[in-house]
């Protein structure tokens, strides 16, 4: 009995040691990711903050309350203080940029994401921040900018870029169609993402077309299709044993 207890204790210690080593290795790999993309992360975070500089230069020309959200036909339906629009929004986007990077670098399957997708993830927020914030500031100082055209166009291009990459995307917990059936079957993941790639590209084209039409139902239908079609297809594959 004594030998059995000692053996059990040694087994538990061995498992704990392996778990600790695994956690240490994962933390080490995440730290290496931070170091590898440090320059890109610093650059993209600064770009996320750059609209703040532009806003401060235009500070005296902008009203105290600024339209920061627009509905169809460029009709403002959301307002923020000048301080929030110029300082708060860029700061929030910069914080979101750092959080997104940390979440991506901490993915247990980070090695499957690939450098191209990581760079795409790191550049989404800064580019969006720069274009959208500058469009908001332009409207605030009386320069007419079609926010609906700009936002639909950006989203459309983003969908096309993501759709182009999806078929090459390997299993991970950060990007792609992350449902139980894709995460537990490599074949299910591969087939789902081949279909999802085309769906997202077509959805991107639809959004670019909608930048001219600016119809809400096209926006909602496109987003619903991008989410539901790949998930539904993945579930059907699962029911077939794939």
Segments from the language model and where they lie:
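Alpha-helical transmembrane segments
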Residues: 78-93, 146-162
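Select subsegments of transmembrane alpha-helices in polytopic membrane proteins
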Residues: 43, 87-92, 119-126, 190-201
């Amino acid at each position: 009995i004594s030998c059995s207890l000692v053996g059990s204790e040694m087994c538990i210690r061995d498992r704990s040691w392996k778990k600790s080593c695994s956690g240490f290795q994962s933390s080490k790999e995440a730290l290496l990711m931070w170091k590898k993309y440090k320059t890109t992360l610093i650059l993209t975070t600064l770009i996320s903050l750059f609209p703040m500089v532009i806003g401060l230069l235009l500070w005296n020309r902008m009203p105290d309350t600024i339209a920061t959200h627009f509905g169809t036909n460029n009709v403002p339906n959301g307002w923020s203080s000048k301080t929030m629009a110029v300082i708060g929004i860029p700061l929030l986007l910069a914080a979101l940029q750092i959080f997104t990077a940390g979440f991506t670098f901490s993915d247990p399957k980070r090695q499957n994401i690939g450098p191209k997708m990581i760079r795409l993830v790191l550049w989404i927020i800064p580019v969006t921040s720069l274009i959208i914030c500058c469009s908001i500031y332009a409207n605030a100082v009386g320069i007419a900018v079609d926010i609906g055209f700009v936002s639909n166009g950006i989203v459309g291009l983003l969908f096309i870029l993501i759709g182009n990459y999806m078929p090459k995307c390997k299993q991970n917990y950060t990007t792609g169609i992350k449902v139980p059936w894709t995460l537990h079957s490599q074949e299910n993941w591969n087939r789902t993402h081949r279909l999802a790639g085309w769906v997202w590209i077509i959805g991107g084209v639809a959004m670019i077309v909608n930048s001219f039409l600016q119809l809400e139902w096209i926006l909602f239908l496109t987003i619903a299709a991008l989410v539901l079609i790949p998930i539904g297809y993945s579930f059907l594959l699962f029911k077939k044993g794939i």
